[in-house]
Amino acid sequence: MPTVEKSVSLKSYNTFAVDVSAQYFAEVCTPEDIRSVLADPRYGQLPRFVLGGGSNTLFTKDFEGIMLHMNGGTIEVTDENDRFYFVKVSAGIVWDDFVRHAIESGWYGIENLAAIPGTVGGAAVQNIGAYGVEVAEHIVEVECFDPDRRAMRVLSAEDLSLIHI
């Protein structure tokens, strides 16, 4: 199980550098990390907040609960054909690092989304976009952890309803 810290300052975890604290804080990378933290009776029933890069989060007060900070992970090609690469990317990967990796690997299509702050998980949730490109155009499905069922769940791009208004 990842280490769970108590009374952690969130100042370095948000781009506004707001100095508030989380009652409990854990760095997580995998679904197993999340599952193990939430399976612990000390943390499983607490309010929870999943934090990525902190670039679209404005804290206004201390968080009373367990803060799960998505951090790191893997980038893996799961399939490919004549036109596409199918890539599984962990939510905690820094978005710009993934874009750079994609360009260096010859996986084109998301290069217009370079230099957008945050993580891959946040990119999918927010449908980041720039210069006529939206990340939704490149998502087939998202695998996510359902904390209530404590199980993985796969959502199709249609299930996500990723649109910009």
Question: What are the language-model segments listed below?
Answer:
Residues 2-138, 142, 146-148:
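Anion-binding (especially nucleotide phosphate/pyrophosphate-binding) glycine-rich loop
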